[in-house]
Amino acid sequence: MSDPHDRSNRFELIAACDEETLAGFANEVLEDDPPLSIRQDPRPQLLMQQVQEPVERRPFNLGEVVVTPAEVELGGTRGFAMIPGKNERAALSGAIVDAAVAANHDRTPAIVESLRAADAQQRAKRRRSWAESRHTTVDFQTMEEQQ
């Protein structure tokens, strides 16, 4: 399980969280009207997705993907989020959530619990998807032995 208090893990958890949950927490954090400045407007952009080639372990540019980044400063604490696809609301909300957790806002325990639940749901979804496609795996060594 990923730790929402670790910033790298939190970035992944926020990116996987649904827009409504992020927006709800962002609105709750902003209820007290803390000082907020937007350091990077949420705007969709292209990002080169790089993977590691499995044979020689060299970096390989897989292609460009659309992401929406945003950065805020909330009461002196910076927050950042990068959401897959075009979703300005989720990116801005995610940046606010990141800043709130980093600053240990009153809503942090509820936010952390929700991020952990989203992580568990995503892991379960990946397991189901893998289980559904697993039977289509081809074992080339077995095929060679049969010839």
What are these regions (language model features)?
Residues 1-33:
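Charge-rich, low-complexity N-terminal segments
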Residues 1-8, 72-82, 130-136:
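Solvent-exposed, charged interface segments at domain starts and junctions
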Residues 3, 32-34, 102-147:
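Cysteine/selenocysteine-centered motifs that mediate thiol-based redox chemistry or coordinate metal-sulfur cofactors
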Residues 12, 62, 77-78, 86-89, ...:
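Non-catalytic, beta-rich accessory domains that mediate macromolecular interactions or localization
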Residues 13, 37, 45-47, 59-66, ...:
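Residue-level preference for alpha-helix termini and adjacent loops
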Residues 28-74, 80-81:
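Structured beta-strand/loop patches that form or line metal/cofactor-binding pockets in enzymes
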Residues 39-41, 49-51, 63-70, 86, ...:
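Surface-exposed loop/turn and secondary-structure junction residues enriched for glycine/proline
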Residues 75-116:
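A hydrophobic, small-residue-rich beta->alpha segment in the mid-to-C-terminal subdomain
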